[in-house]
């Protein structure tokens, strides 16, 4: 039990298992290039480099202004890590075929944590993104030092760079091409090691650093030396040069205001229940300083809330189950038998925690769902064993004889019953790919819990039964009225009722069979007409009955500027935001991409999405909505948006 408690406290806690999706996202930035140039010079070259990569199911690519996006999907159950390394080597080995001006490609191994971070820390305010970025960078340093944090990524920041604008007429006049200028600038803006040197104090490394530091450094770069000895420099074809920001491909806002977001991703052993409070401590440390600058911190996508809710559900379910089963067993077999049967529930769960911890699994919504599902099953075996031992005691056997005979008599039936339950869930392990890995914790947790309960009821429970009340206690047997033996009145009443029902069933067996088949086909008919919508006897809901966030996807005409999409998202955010926080918690807007239902990214300057977070169930107070039904709230949102968005924009809403 002590080891089980230690394992429970040591288990990583997360919302969902951090499953590898078997996909790699390759992002390559090519500043200033048109979508057509990106397609021909970057995307196609990278695809060609991956032609002979094995175990690839498909490659899906998109080219945008200044950016190439390629998703490579591997065949299910491949060695994803090995394939990821091979893919990376192939792309980097083909860099000579790519334009010199591109940024090094970024490789993201897509997993659940990439799209569902532990928590998002958003800095919002009427300040420039550069100012917000400086504050976020300072906070990022402390957030990265939190135990259990794998990485902290910054989004919404603008990359600062020096823009050189050339004069086309001067270039024609001097016979200078754009490529010549680019090559000259790249050749001059370098840093490279020049060897080692020794002196009296020791050895040091010599580095030649010729990177640009001033505008004049750029202007003096030689593009070409003519035959007469004259030089053509950048300043000869320069129109203007100034510090600026690279055009973003995603613009983020929260509650209709500019923001810079810090995405916090936990490592495999991290515990959400520990990480989020530590994040709040860091935020509180910066709160006063940020408030003076007019900056507000808003936390979104806090996964701890959902984990807490799942743990509360499991705890309530276990508590109610223990109380009800205890009362039932107490009524039929007495207090001692009830306690002995109930001991199996915590024992089985703690033994399961040891197994989960030893095999590298985690506590999450999937495993917690499995525990809730199995919580009513694990006590069944203990009830059978306790009842049979109790029956042998009633028949006059000694305590030791009753324990031995009662347990051995039901050992094989209990094992057979347990095996059939396990066999019903084990086929889930046959599922392949990321889906199979995602749901694998259900059969693993259920099988471990049932196996633990089997061990407890056949080994531990008989020992407890023998030790309590002890060998010297003389069991009393009382003959109750209306019973045929020494059993309790409630048991006798149930037995008589059962005998009558069974007798009538056997007497009218054909009628019974007809009723069984009739009810079976009636239930099938009800299910069919309800699902088809012809006669909905059972209400079929498109959305889940309860949820705490939903997505609103916007798509504008092709060619819409990213800034226009961002402004449209801000307008919708401001339009939906209520005056009361008990109606809506936050709205996070991201212009430039949205996620499909299966979490596949779709990029484009004309698309974007809103992530709307609702208050928790107990904190909601929707205006003029009965029972604070989120489905009714969503219907109202749809009506509002339909009247707000014009015909040029399409809108989709989904939980």
What residue spans do the PLM features occupy?
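Helix-loop junctions and hydrophobic alpha-helical segments within the transmembrane domains
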Residues: 300, 311, 386, 392-419, ...
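Transmembrane alpha-helices and their membrane-interface boundaries in multi-pass membrane transporters
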Residues: 375-389, 411-430, 437-484, 610
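Signature of alpha-helical transmembrane segments and their immediate interfacial
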Residues: 1-13, 410, 481-539
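Hydrophobic transmembrane alpha-helices and their membrane-interface caps
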Residues: 6-15, 323-331, 335-391
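Juxtamembrane "pre-transmembrane" interface segments
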Residues: 153-157, 165, 236-238, 253-327, ...
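Membrane-proximal juxtamembrane linkers immediately C-terminal to transmembrane helices
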Residues: 13-30, 63, 110-116, 534-558, ...
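Surface-exposed amphipathic alpha-helical segments in non-transmembrane regions
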Residues: 1-6, 10, 41-58, 73-160, ...
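Membrane-water interface of transmembrane alpha-helices in multipass transporters/channels
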Residues: 15-20, 334-344, 359-374, 430-447, ...
């Amino acid at each position: 039990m002590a080891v089980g408690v230690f394992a429970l406290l040591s288990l990583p806690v997360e919302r969902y298992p951090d499953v590898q999706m078997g996909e790699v996202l390759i992002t390559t930035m090519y500043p200033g290039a048109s979508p057509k140039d990106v397609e021909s010079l970057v995307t196609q070259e990278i695809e060609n480099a991956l032609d002979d990569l094995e175990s690839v199911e498909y490659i899906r690519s998109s080219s945008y202004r200044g950016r190439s996006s390629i998703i490579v999907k591997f065949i299910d159950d491949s060695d994803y890590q090995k394939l990821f390394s091979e893919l990376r080597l192939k792309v980097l080995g083909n860099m000579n075929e790519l334009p010199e001006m591109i940024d090094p490609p970024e490789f993201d191994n897509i997993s659940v944590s990439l799209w569902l971070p532990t928590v998002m820390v958003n800095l919002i305010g009427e300040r420039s993104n550069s100012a917000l970025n400086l504050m976020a960078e300072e906070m990022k340093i402390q957030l990265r030092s939190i135990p259990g944090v794998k990485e902290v990524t910054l989004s919404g920041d603008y990359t600062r760079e020096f823009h050189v604008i050339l004069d086309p007429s001067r270039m024609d006049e001097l016979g200078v091409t754009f490529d010549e200028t680019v090559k000259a600038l790249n050749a001059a803006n370098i840093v490279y090691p020049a060897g080692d040197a020794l002196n009296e104090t020791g050895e040091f490394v010599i580095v030649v650093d010729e990177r640009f530091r001033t505008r004049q450094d750029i202007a003096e770069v030689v593009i070409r030396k003519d035959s007469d000895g004259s030089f053509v420099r950048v300043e000869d074809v320069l129109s203007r040069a100034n510090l600026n920001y690279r055009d973003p491909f995603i613009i983020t806002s929260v509650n209709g205001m500019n923001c810079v977001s810090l995405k916090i991703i936990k490592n495999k052993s991290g515990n959400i229940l520990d990480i989020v409070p530590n994040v709040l401590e860091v935020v509180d440390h910066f709160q006063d300083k940020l408030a003076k600058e007019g900056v507000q911190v808003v936390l979104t996508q806090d996964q701890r809330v959902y984990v807490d809710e799942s743990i509360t559900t499991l705890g309530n379910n276990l508590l109610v189950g223990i109380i009800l089963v205890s009362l039932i067993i107490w009524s039929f077999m007495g207090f001692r038998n009830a306690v002995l049967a109930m001991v199996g529930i915590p024992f089985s769960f703690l033994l399961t925690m040891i197994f989960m911890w030893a095999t590298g699994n985690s506590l999450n919504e999937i495993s917690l769902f499995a525990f809730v599902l199995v919580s009513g099953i694990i006590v069944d075996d203990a009830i059978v064993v306790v009842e049979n031992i109790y029956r042998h005691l009633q028949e006059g056997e000694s305590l030791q004889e009753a324990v031995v005979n009662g347990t051995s008599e039901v050992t094989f039936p209990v094992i057979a019953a347990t095996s059939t339950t396990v066999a019903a869930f084990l086929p889930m392990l046959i599922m392949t790919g990321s889906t199979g890995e995602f749901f694998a914790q259900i059969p693993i947790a259920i099988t471990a819990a049932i196996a633990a309960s089997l061990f407890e009821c056949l080994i531990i429970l008989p020992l407890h039964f023998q030790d309590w009340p002890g060998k010297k206690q003389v069991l009393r047997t009382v003959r109750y009225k209306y019973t045929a033996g020494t059993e309790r009145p409630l048991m006798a009443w149930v037995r008589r009722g059962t005998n009558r029902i069974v007798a009538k069933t056997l007497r009218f067996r054909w009628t019974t069979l007809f009723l069984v088949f009739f009810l079976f086909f009636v239930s099938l008919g009800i299910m069919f007409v309800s699902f088809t919508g012809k006669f909905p006897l059972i209400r079929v809901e498109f959305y889940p009955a309860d949820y705490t966030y939903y997505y609103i996807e916007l798509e504008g005409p092709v060619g819409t500027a990213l800034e226009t999409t961002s402004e449209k998202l801000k307008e919708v955010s401001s339009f939906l935001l209520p005056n009361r926080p008990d109606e809506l918690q936050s709205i996070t807007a991201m212009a430039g991409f949205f996620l499909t239902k299966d979490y596949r990214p779709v990029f484009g300057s004309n698309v974007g999405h809103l992530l709307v977070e609702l208050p928790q169930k107990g904190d909601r107070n929707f205006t003029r909505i009965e029972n604070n039904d989120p489905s009714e709230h969503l219907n109202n949102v749809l009506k509002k948006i339909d009247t707000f968005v014009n015909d040029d924009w399409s809108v989709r809403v989904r939980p």
